[in-house]
A protein has these predicted regions:
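A charged, well-structured terminal subsegment
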Residues: 48-77
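A short acidic, often aromatic-flanked loop/helix-cap motif at beta-alpha or helix-coil junctions
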Residues: 45-50, 86
Protein backbone atom coordinates (compact mmCIF):
# COMPACT_ATOMS: atom_id res chain seq x y z
CA UNK A 1 0.00 0.00 0.00
CA UNK A 2 1.14 3.55 -0.69
CA UNK A 3 3.20 5.08 2.14
CA UNK A 4 1.27 8.35 1.86
CA UNK A 5 -2.10 6.59 2.10
CA UNK A 6 -0.96 4.66 5.17
CA UNK A 7 0.30 7.87 6.75
CA UNK A 8 -2.97 9.69 6.17
CA UNK A 9 -4.97 6.73 7.47
CA UNK A 10 -2.80 6.68 10.60
CA UNK A 11 -3.43 10.36 11.22
CA UNK A 12 -7.19 9.79 10.89
CA UNK A 13 -7.09 6.85 13.31
CA UNK A 14 -5.00 8.84 15.80
CA UNK A 15 -7.49 11.73 15.62
CA UNK A 16 -10.12 9.24 16.78
CA UNK A 17 -8.05 7.93 19.68
CA UNK A 18 -6.54 4.84 18.06
CA UNK A 19 -2.74 4.71 18.46
CA UNK A 20 -0.73 3.78 15.36
CA UNK A 21 2.80 3.04 14.26
CA UNK A 22 3.86 2.97 10.63
CA UNK A 23 6.45 0.52 9.32
CA UNK A 24 7.84 1.95 6.10
CA UNK A 25 10.73 2.33 3.69
CA UNK A 26 9.99 5.80 2.26
CA UNK A 27 11.18 8.04 5.08
CA UNK A 28 10.67 11.33 3.25
CA UNK A 29 7.05 10.58 2.37
CA UNK A 30 6.00 9.19 5.75
CA UNK A 31 7.63 11.98 7.73
CA UNK A 32 6.08 14.57 5.41
CA UNK A 33 2.64 13.13 6.25
CA UNK A 34 3.35 13.83 9.92
CA UNK A 35 2.61 10.40 11.33
CA UNK A 36 2.85 10.09 15.13
CA UNK A 37 5.16 7.06 15.23
CA UNK A 38 7.28 5.62 12.44
CA UNK A 39 9.69 2.69 12.19
CA UNK A 40 11.91 3.35 9.17
CA UNK A 41 13.59 0.39 7.47
CA UNK A 42 16.25 1.35 4.92
CA UNK A 43 15.06 -1.37 2.54
CA UNK A 44 13.71 -1.34 -1.01
CA UNK A 45 10.07 -0.28 -1.26
CA UNK A 46 7.66 -3.09 -0.53
CA UNK A 47 9.74 -4.56 2.29
CA UNK A 48 8.55 -2.53 5.27
CA UNK A 49 7.93 -5.66 7.33
CA UNK A 50 11.45 -7.09 6.96
CA UNK A 51 13.39 -9.08 4.41
CA UNK A 52 11.34 -11.46 2.21
CA UNK A 53 11.28 -15.06 3.48
CA UNK A 54 13.35 -14.01 6.53
CA UNK A 55 11.10 -14.71 9.50
CA UNK A 56 13.72 -13.49 11.98
CA UNK A 57 14.03 -10.06 10.35
CA UNK A 58 10.24 -9.82 10.12
CA UNK A 59 9.82 -10.67 13.81
CA UNK A 60 12.51 -8.18 14.77
CA UNK A 61 10.86 -5.47 12.66
CA UNK A 62 7.48 -6.10 14.28
CA UNK A 63 9.03 -6.08 17.77
CA UNK A 64 10.72 -2.75 17.03
CA UNK A 65 7.46 -1.28 15.73
CA UNK A 66 5.61 -2.34 18.87
CA UNK A 67 8.38 -0.83 20.98
CA UNK A 68 7.97 2.47 19.10
CA UNK A 69 4.21 2.29 19.67
CA UNK A 70 4.58 1.93 23.42
CA UNK A 71 7.56 4.18 24.07
CA UNK A 72 7.63 7.06 21.56
CA UNK A 73 8.59 10.12 23.61
CA UNK A 74 6.76 12.64 21.42
CA UNK A 75 4.60 13.04 18.36
CA UNK A 76 6.31 12.52 15.00
CA UNK A 77 8.85 10.09 16.44
CA UNK A 78 10.95 8.15 13.92
CA UNK A 79 13.10 5.17 14.85
CA UNK A 80 15.46 3.71 12.25
CA UNK A 81 15.69 -0.06 12.21
CA UNK A 82 19.22 -1.38 12.72
CA UNK A 83 18.58 -4.08 10.10
CA UNK A 84 20.33 -3.77 6.74
CA UNK A 85 19.20 -5.10 3.38
CA UNK A 86 22.78 -6.05 2.61
CA UNK A 87 26.13 -5.27 4.22
CA UNK A 88 27.33 -2.57 1.85
CA UNK A 89 24.11 -0.86 0.75
CA UNK A 90 24.85 -1.63 -2.89
CA UNK A 91 21.17 -2.38 -3.56
CA UNK A 92 20.58 1.38 -3.68
CA UNK A 93 22.82 1.70 -6.73
CA UNK A 94 20.73 -0.74 -8.75
CA UNK A 95 17.25 -0.31 -7.32
CA UNK A 96 14.91 0.87 -10.08
CA UNK A 97 17.84 1.87 -12.32
CA UNK A 98 16.49 1.00 -15.74
CA UNK A 99 19.74 2.09 -17.39
CA UNK A 100 21.31 -1.09 -16.03
CA UNK A 101 18.75 -3.33 -17.74
CA UNK A 102 18.65 -4.29 -21.38
CA UNK A 103 15.49 -3.51 -23.37
CA UNK A 104 14.88 -7.27 -23.51
CA UNK A 105 15.06 -7.59 -19.72
CA UNK A 106 12.72 -4.62 -19.27
CA UNK A 107 10.23 -6.24 -21.68
CA UNK A 108 10.54 -9.53 -19.79
CA UNK A 109 9.87 -7.85 -16.45
CA UNK A 110 6.91 -5.96 -17.90
CA UNK A 111 5.48 -9.24 -19.23
CA UNK A 112 5.91 -10.91 -15.81
CA UNK A 113 4.20 -7.98 -14.11
CA UNK A 114 1.31 -8.06 -16.58
CA UNK A 115 0.89 -11.80 -15.95
CA UNK A 116 0.68 -11.21 -12.19
CA UNK A 117 -1.92 -8.49 -12.72
CA UNK A 118 -3.97 -10.86 -14.88
CA UNK A 119 -3.95 -13.50 -12.13
CA UNK A 120 -4.88 -10.90 -9.50
CA UNK A 121 -7.73 -9.56 -11.63
CA UNK A 122 -9.11 -13.07 -12.17
CA UNK A 123 -9.01 -13.78 -8.43
CA UNK A 124 -10.68 -10.47 -7.62
CA UNK A 125 -13.45 -11.07 -10.15
CA UNK A 126 -13.98 -14.64 -8.91
CA UNK A 127 -14.54 -13.52 -5.33
Amino acid sequence: MCHQTVGLAARHLEAHGIPTVIMGCAKDIVEHCGVPRFLFSDFPLGNSGGRPFDVESQAQTLALALRVLESAPAARTTLQSPLRWNADGSWKLDYLDLTKLSPERIAERRKEFDEVKTVARAKREAS
